[in-house]
Amino acid sequence: GYVYIEVPTGTETVFLGDMLIDNEFQSSDGFTMAIGMAVDGSKHYIDIAKACHILISGMTGSGKSIVLHNLILSLLMKKNPAQMHLYIIDPKATEFEYYKNLAACTVVSEVNGAVELLKNLCIEMDRRYSILASTGCRDIDSYNTKFADAPMRRDIVFIDELSDLMSMGGKSVEGHIVRIAQKARACGIHLVIATQYPVAKVVTGLIKANMPTKICLRVGTVTNSMVALDMAGGEKLMGHGDMLFLPNGSLSPVRLQGGFVSETAINNVVAGLMKNQ
């Protein structure tokens, strides 16, 4: 008889820059973001409009922050401030400071400021739905087709650590997040929420049910993986960008290696954007 032994392969570094110069990214006209590369060499991207909202889970060292940088940089390379605005909630106040002077970005590190931002986005969501209703438009895309000279921009909210926000901001945080997650997609407001603590107390049932796209990096336990992805497997990943990616509408995840981007590369991209704004 034969004995089969599964040997983990060494992970080859995937660079974000290579994904951003790829023709698939360059030729896409949506709000396209680079996710990672599969073992067969295929590159995976997703449009925030199709993703709706994204939940990213991963313990320290899993590559969670790099994934957030990849998504942010993809959007900044793709769209201008008239087309989108990125709100980055950064409780650590260090990870996303690079972007604070860009016209397309607002970085918030104070919890009170973050709660206020989420509340204001709920108000903005209601305002947009009033406009859509009064103009007979079904969603932001039909509105922007009809009023191409004065389009509605997409607002994308990145939350670096949900547990910090939930513990310090109280129930109002969950209430605002759930309202946005349930209703805001059609009017062009999206959430990208990251946590290193995928437990039911942090990623509540209502939040999870309304985050249809999931990225699970290495997590500590099977239970964490079940919260992050609705299935086991995240606990067996290798860290450093090794991920299971479950796009909106898909039943089974694909294993990818997320793109790497250095601090120098981030600074160079931001400097180039600053020059042109």
Report each predicted region and the residues it spans.
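P-loop NTPase catalytic phosphate-binding loop
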Residues: Y2-E6, V14, M19-R138, P151-L237, ...
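Active-site nucleophile elbow and catalytic-triad environment of alpha/beta-hydrolase enzymes
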Residues: D141
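Conserved helix/coil segment N-terminal to the catalytic DExD/H
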Residues: N144-D149
